[in-house]
Structure formats: structure tokens, C-alpha cells
Amino acid sequence: MSAVSMLQGEMLARGGAVIARGASLATARNFSRTTVPMAKIRKERDTFGELEVPADKYYGAQTARSQMNFKIGGPEERMPIPVIHAFGILKKAAALVNTEFGLDKKLADAISQAADEVVDGKLDEHFPLVTWQTGSGTQSNMNVNEVISNRAIEILGGELGSKKPVHPNDHVNMSQSSNDTFPTAMHIAVGREVNSRLLPALKKLRTALHNKAEEFKDIIKIGRTHTQDAVPLTLGQEFSAYVTQLDNSIARVESTLPRLYQLAAGGTAVGTGLNTRKGFAEKVAATVSELTGLPFVTAPNKFEALAAHDALVEVHGALNTVAVSFMKIGNDIRFLGSGPRCGLGELSLPENEPGSSIMPGKVNPTQCEAITMVAAQVMGNQVAVSVGGSNGHFELNVFKPLIVRNVLQSTRLLADSAVSFTDHCVDGIVANKDNIAKIMRESLMLVTALNPHIGYDNAAKIAKTAHKNGTTLVQEAVKLGILTEEQFAQWVKPENMLGPK
């Protein structure tokens, strides 16, 4: 059965199901007279035989066959578009280089033009395949080859599906294998997304947190360890920790890029470079670098580049650490902003939308909730990427689509949530100075300043007695005869407790 016939059958089945769920008899009779228009088709062939494909699509038989064999997840599970666009970059680079090794320039120019349209997103609708296919990504590589081939044929005035004058394997896939093109596209896609989306977003959040650390540098508050009262610090010092977490996150991500920039192209089937020419790998990497503006190079060992994806596992390890930082920062700000009257209430967070369908006036820390949910998703993706990376069997890793899907999702979610958290939360945070001061004055841990003067045991006695009696530190210190009010006022000054003496 062709892909078109199957689609028509599913449409009819869905229509029948609607009738069965309660449509009137009149409606049912009316439906029975409705004719579903037949989509125009053309016939294409692969090594398994002939298949019908939609006439208005550039893909061919191998793509249609994959649609038939891998009905897993539907449109939501399609191969990530950044991978498709990365393939366009690679196919253009290969065509340009292959002109040095026998590819007719006229064909190369048509392939290059079609590949540009892939990169620009003009042909996105022609890439229907899902992530859950062969672990090498062969079907997606052929999807790209077929689309570029047919579009190039169209550019040259030929007949779609004829494979003349541009053949998907012989010309678009010249000097290539799915085993080296898919990992190359993986690296290009992730490299572009990290540089264009993630790093700018992290730097934006870092700047916003730094601005708040400066704004809050003179606000003294009580610290908390184990969620219990501790000694004072400034709110600026507290936020400076978040700034450093972002600094380190950016540095960690950037430190993974040298391995990510190594491309498998030129390794072909198992890493030996069979069916390529000397210099092809280096020239393709240099051309990809020129097209992307990123410092891609050929992988020094193609066997590793095909059989293992440690570089992407490493990238996601850095992303996972970013997620860990996001979870901590989001939770801290959420809890510091709890209230407004019965929580900590040290921070006021921007009020962006109503928070409850039943409690009037309630507003929630939704940006904190969103960024911590993103963090949880990325942590889950870390498991999937680790499992995928560990499944390189002999000369080929066969979890490639899963790996790149999760790395790209984590990259996108972290980037978008960082921007959202910055714009709709961090930039609008206000310190509640009066409440911060009130909480600090009530803390028993200010007694720590007395350790050098009266010793740990006496200081502990004052704190425990004050806690038991519900009194203040100074009241119990004087009552116990350990020191005077003047001594207490002289020695217990929060502003003198913010660093080494």
C-alpha cells in the first residue's frame, strides 16, 4: 500500500469513527455521499521496489517507506528541524568539494541551490520522518538526499522522481554514508544552536543576576543553612553566588565546543573513508566552517567519530549542570519570594498573571516553576543521552537520533527558559528591605558574633534560653549575667559580620 493510500484510509477511518460516536443518521447519510478527493501522486523506486508518493512533495521512495515502517509518535516526534538544516549545510559543502573530485559543476550548483533552500527552512514540510527510526539516521539522510535531488532536478528542468540528471545517492550523497553524514549533521546542529541560542541566553541571565547583585549589595539579611537561620550576609552576596553559577555554566558549555567542532564527514561507512578521495574530509570541514562561521574541523579519528558520541554526551553533561544551577536559583528565588504575608517575603517577584481559578487575587512564582520544570526535563534527558551514548556497538553507534533529539531539546529549553526567567522575573525582582531587616533582628544566630568574646558554650546558652523563652538575645544575655546591653550592642553588629576581620 502506498503512503498516499494509507493516508486516505486513515482519513476515512477517522470520519467513520466520528459517525459512530453519535452523529445523526442524516449526517451519516450525507457523509456517505461525500467523496474524498484523491491526492495527486507520482511513482518512485528504491531497491525494494516501486512506491507512490505525493506529487507535491520532493521526497521519494525511501522516505515514503520509512513513513510506512515507523509510525511512532506522529508529527510531534519528527526529526528536529535544526538537524535537517544542518544536513543542508553539509550537502552543500559536499557538493562544492566534490566538484574537485569529478562532480559536474552544473549538478553541483543545482544541489547547492536546493541545499540553500533546505538551510533557509523553505522546504521544511518535505521532511516528515520521526526520530524513532534506524539508529544511524539512514532514513533521514536519504530523506535529505531525495528532497535535494528532486528539487535540483526541478531547478534543471527535469522530471521529479526520475533521478536524472541529479541522483540522490550518486550525486547528493557522493563521497558520503549515512554513518558519517548523520553524526556530522548532529555536531553542526548542536554547534549552531549552542552558539546562536544557548550561550547568548545564559549571558543575558548572568547580566541580569549581576545587576541585581549590585543593586542589593548593601542590604544585610539573615543567611540560611539547612533551611535554618544562620549568620548574616548581604542580599547582593547571595545573588553573587547565582552570578558565579552562570559564569561557570557558560565556561563549562564553552569548554565542550572543541570536541563538538570535530566532524565525522569523510569516514563513510566504518571510518576508513572508503569511496572518498584524499583531502575530501578536510575540505568538507573547512567548507562547513566557512558556511557556518564556526571553527569546524575534520575529526582526527573517524572510527571514534562514528562509533562513539562522547562529544555530545559531554555537551549534555554541561547542559545538565546548567539545569542543576537553574533548579537551585529558581528554588531560592521562589522561596525568598514566598508570601506575600505568611512566607519569607524577602523578595517581591513580578506579578505576571492570575494564579488561581478559585482563590481571588492569588499570584504565583510561575517563572520559577517553569525554569525548574525545564531543569527537571534536562536532567531526564541526561539519562537518555547517557544510555544513547553508551550504545556504540563495534564500528557504529545506533542511538544517534535519540542523542541529538535530547541534546537539542535541552539546549532549546535551557535557552528559552533563561530568557523568559530574565525578562519576566529577574529584571523585576524587588527587595523587601523592611521585612528583611525585621527577620534579621529576630534571628538567634546573631549570637555567633559573641563567640570570640564569651566563648561558644556561653553563646549557645544565650541562644537556647532565648529560643525557649521567646525572648531576644540581648534580654537573655543580660538576664543570665553574661554581658551588658552595652557590650551586646558593641559586639553584635550585623554589618561587621559580613566577612573576615
Curated annotation (Swiss-Prot):
Could you say which EC number(s) this protein's record lists?
4.2.1.2
- GO BP, one example? fumarate metabolic process
Under catalytic activity, the entry for this protein gives: (S)-malate = fumarate + H2O
Major site of localization recorded for this protein: mitochondrion
Pathway field of the UniProt record reads: Carbohydrate metabolism; tricarboxylic acid cycle; (S)-malate from fumarate: step 1/1
- Which CDD domains does this entry report, sorted A to Z? Fumarase_classII
Q: Where in the cell is it found?
A: Mitochondrion matrix; Cytoplasm
Carries keyword Hydrolase? no
Is Transmembrane helix included in the keywords of this UniProt record?
no
> What superkingdom does the record give?
Eukaryota
PROSITE patterns attached to this UniProt entry: FUMARATE_LYASES
As for what it does, the entry says:
Catalyzes the reversible stereospecific interconversion of fumarate to L-malate. In mitochondrion, catalyzes the hydration of fumarate to L-malate in the tricarboxylic acid (TCA) cycle to facilitate a transition step in the production of energy in the form of NADH.
What else is on record for this protein?
There are 2 substrate-binding sites: the catalytic A site, and the non-catalytic B site that may play a role in the transfer of substrate or product between the active site and the solvent. Alternatively, the B site may bind allosteric effectors.
Q: Which family does it belong to?
A: Belongs to the class-II fumarase/aspartase family. Fumarase subfamily.
Which named protein is this? Answer: Probable fumarate hydratase, mitochondrial
Identify the gene encoding this protein.
fum-1
